[in-house]
Amino acid sequence: MLVFEFKAYGKSAQLVAIDDAIRTAKFIRNSCIRLWMDIKGTGKNDLQKYCAVLAANFPFANELNSMARQASAERAWSSISHFYDNCKKGISGLKGYPQFQKDCRSVEYKTSGWKLADNRKSITFNDKKGIGRLKLKGTRDLHFYQINQIKRVRLVKRADGVYVQFCIDVNRFENIEPTGNTIGLDVGLKEYYTDSDGTIVENPKFLRIGEKVLKRSQRRVSKKVKGSKNRGKARLYLGKRHLFAINNAYNE
């Protein structure tokens, strides 16, 4: 499974619709967790059926695509099954009891509810949330893959905007010929690693480099009045600085 990510661009009304879809996905997941807590013996199929009940009782839940509702129920069951596995294995300490999600930043669609343009430069979400057509910008080329190979589409919200992730079902084969050489690695804190040939790679310390900026940005947020626009702006800037440090670590 390959995951390709593109930056999405849309109007302000579309961004509001994306926020609404993400909140609805969070509501469905938390409702499934509550059902599992209240009714003993609730299984995965029961959570899938409960999605239809939520759609019938809540109009905003009915606006979300049916497969997107099922994907949210699968997220709830994933946390439940993880808790069951930890209990069966007898892991010491906390077992990871399913918790209600407070901050949700993504909504996942399966094979329906969206349509990719022929030029692969835009995607249209056609459920009742009103997201509509979003422009895509990225370095990956989706022309190499068929539409039926795209099994999941995620809308992910970050500090610097909205991203669209495509989960593509493809088998990767890499012909790797062994060289016959052996090497030893010593991973440390001062140096990132030192191999047996004497090569030393320094620790980049991305968090330490941007720590002063992060602390200063956090102080700016703390000094602002709660609920004010200035606090919202400072909070967004702080999120972008955190995202900048994370992206540097991933790109290295």
Which stretches of residues belong to each language-model region?
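Nucleic-acid substrate recognition interfaces
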Residues: 1-252
